[in-house]
Amino acid sequence: MEIPSTSSEMTYFSVKCAICYKAGHGQHFGVETCRACAAFFRRTVVLNRKYKCTRKSGKCKIGSDETKDVMCKFCRFKKCIDLGMTTENVRTDQVINLNVEPSTSQSLVRLEMTSLQPETDDSNRVQYQIIHPRTRGPAILIDVNAIIKRSKTILETHFFPDDDVIVELNPLEKMTFCLRKLRSKQSWNPNFFTKINFLDLFEFWESQMEDTATWLMYSGEFRKLPNHEKIAIFKIVWAVWRRLERYTMTAQVFGQKCYDEQILLHSHQDAARFTDYDVDYSYITDQGFEKINGLFGGKMIQYFDIIVKPYLELELSDTEIAYILCQIVWNYAGRRLQGQTQAAGERFLEVISNNLHKYYEDKSGNRKRAEDKQNYVARLAKMMQIVNQMLNAQLKMENTMDVAMLFNTFNIVFTEPEFFRV
């Protein structure tokens, strides 16, 4: 039996930007801010901008009625610094050296960058060459905001062109509908590559981020959350969502061959065999492919046993894959973020569990045999085993990445590391 949506409606709260007091958009650089103030701070740091107080006092009241239309850039940035907005708060301190003197009108942020940096503000630019303050060698700063621009747009909209199609569907059916819609783009005759530059993988990831954002927005419970909460969830779940979706999609396309030859679809058009391709890491590390593959390669291969093998044995349906995705995403987000994310997740998972029960009942038709119920219970247990193994593998992957970053294995840093902990 489904839970009536009106019986346990939840109200979620939003936060205000600590800088300008407008609607907040989550934590950026260590402080709850709106998107505009976060982008302003990022541009100031990355582009080495210098400001002077418009009133020459350095004491403009940012966020007050008198400054709500036009904010003094110097005082706005000074307030960012005073409230604790630093790149250190997002774990980019291993690359960026911030020196601030907020008390004078000549204050500026000095970001050590190479001579190759352009003077213009290119909001679509992803990579910046900088000097690593620990190793003093060249390093790459990846601006995550440029990568997730379209994903954020998806997360902030409340309109879908197929609203009239899904209005009669229950929550699990909506998630399944979206999964099928996204997978309709998949080529069943993909190109196989044997070599790829690590930075080229971002093109795959950007597309998969958009798919993740689109899929999440088909959850009514997710859509009711404030924007900053949706972004926070998206940041940490896109990678684990991508992993399950790509491995199960590969198994659907290639069948047993996927498991036997260790094939993975990296995008809707591209695939590779783990035994017959390598990634060029030379641009971001001097460790070499063999060492990096030894560190992470085995952890990726394990998913053929965790995901592909049971998928083939159970012949999982799209509905069951959508259910597993929901379980992984909301359990993982709830553990990491807790609070209203955890509450929303518990509510949503309870509803889709009832939806899955109805799905199995509909498959049985008029049959109410005990063996049918026993089969579905055993099937559900194996599906939840996939969920638990995925969550455990995710934790180990995070620990490996943390160690790699601690010992400066990569000379690459992200403006928002949460996106790429895995």
Swiss-Prot record:
InterPro entries: C.elegans_Orphan_NR, HNF4-like_DBD, NHR-like_dom_sf, Nucl_hrmn_rcpt_lig-bd, Znf_hrmn_rcpt, Znf_NHR/GATA. Its main location: nucleus. It is found in: Nucleus. Disulfide bonds: none annotated. GO terms for molecular function: DNA-binding transcription factor activity; RNA polymerase II cis-regulatory region sequence-specific DNA binding; zinc ion binding. Residues 161-422 form the NR LBD domain. Gene3D superfamilies: Erythroid Transcription Factor GATA-1, subunit A, Retinoid X Receptor. SUPFAM superfamilies: Glucocorticoid receptor-like (DNA-binding domain), Nuclear receptor ligand-binding domain. It holds the Pfam family Hormone_recep. The keyword Transcription applies. GO terms for cellular component: nucleus. Keywords: DNA-binding, Metal-binding, Nucleus, Receptor, Transcription, Transcription regulation, Zinc, Zinc-finger. A zinc finger (NR C4-type) spans 17-37, 53-80. PROSITE patterns: NR_LBD (PS51843), NUCLEAR_REC_DBD_1 (PS00031), NUCLEAR_REC_DBD_2 (PS51030). Residues 14-92 bind DNA. It comes from the Eukaryota. The keyword Signal does not apply. Belongs to the nuclear hormone receptor family. Orphan nuclear receptor. This is Nuclear hormone receptor family member nhr-54. It comes from Caenorhabditis elegans. The gene is nhr-54.
